[in-house]
Amino acid sequence: MKYAYQIQKMYEEMSMEFCELNQMKKGVLRIGVTERMGSLLLPQVLERFRTKYPNIQLDIVEKGGVDLEEMLAKGGLDMALVSLPLKYPSLPSHVFYEDPFLIAVPKDHPMNEVWKEKEALPVTVLKGQELLLTRRFKKTRLIAEQILEPLKGDYRIITESYSIETIIRLAAENMGISLVPEIYAKAYDCGDRLQYYRIENCPVTWKWAVVFSSDPQNLTRPSKELYKILSLIHFPV
């Protein structure tokens, strides 16, 4: 399978080179993106790209981050947008956005009366609290656990879910407190049912990176342009 990817990639790279010599009239750019992240990132990114390269065919592959890394390692993609950390750290990557986590508190939670005048809270306010978190193999869970390290386990996880959207909806139904990436807090708006607080002096962020199948210096012109667009857009969208 690895060699099949490599042969296909060689053919597409040759097509892209001819495309560059012919004012970008044709070519294929294979982009990987993790589930959910695609709907948040790609619309405005690809709209700008299509304006400049209207005849480049975009082949979008949506899979889990590890699957995308494996495809990159085998040459099956030109680039992928994934969150860190990487399973294959030898792949060239560049962070283009860092998303802070927020404390999501249900509107009717009794502690809201204590916190309601504040915009940011120390993570220590979560001591002894019942929390909703994504499952252990999810990268959002890994980041949440890093944020919670100062508590030394002094909290109780009452519900786990594969989906961060499910966690947000459960928190909005007064099921417990959660830690939510800011971009998802904006994407899955629950109105006034959730109160969000920033975390004081928290160095931990959810890092998003563009990962390449080879040295970024060897990227085709359209690939470089897509990377440039990613670097210039200010997220969260």
Language model regions located:
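Secondary-structure junction motif
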Residues: 111-113, 119-121, 129-151, 219-227, ...
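Beta-alpha-beta core module
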Residues: 88-95, 99, 165-215
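Alpha-helical "hinge/linker" immediately C-terminal to small N-terminal DNA-binding modules
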Residues: 1-26
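Short beta-strand-centered segments that line the small-molecule binding cleft or hinge
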Residues: 21, 44-48, 65-106, 114-115, ...
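Hydrophobic hinge/microswitch elements
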Residues: 64-77, 82-83, 139-195
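Central regulatory/effector-binding core of bacterial HTH transcription factors
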Residues: 26-89, 152, 160-161
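Short, well-ordered beta-strand segments
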Residues: 28-32, 80, 104, 132, ...
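A late-sequence structural motif
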Residues: 41, 195-237
